[in-house]
């Protein structure tokens, strides 16, 4: 039997609760309990991605594996602010169709950071979720 936390989302408030639980329960030893810039930035990105998955993905793709795949497809380049990753392209398309979409609003806030900062945020997101990105969970 598998547990899919995204299956319990019914509202945007639930997305935020899930993101809070994810951050709280993956805090490393020695990590400060006060929330710094990096954690807040991660929170924005997770909210955007989970919002996208919940609203836009096919029912069978509304799961943690899709979240991991989106994070793995994310990229920022310090030397090229115009570069667009596959995830950037997904959100650009969604923004054209639905500029007030919950996920788009979260993503816009996340993308306010410069390339070097975005890269650091993405590394933090990848590091936080790396224990879940194993074949056993994908099967």
What are these regions (language model features)?
Residues 1-139:
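P-loop NTPase motor domains
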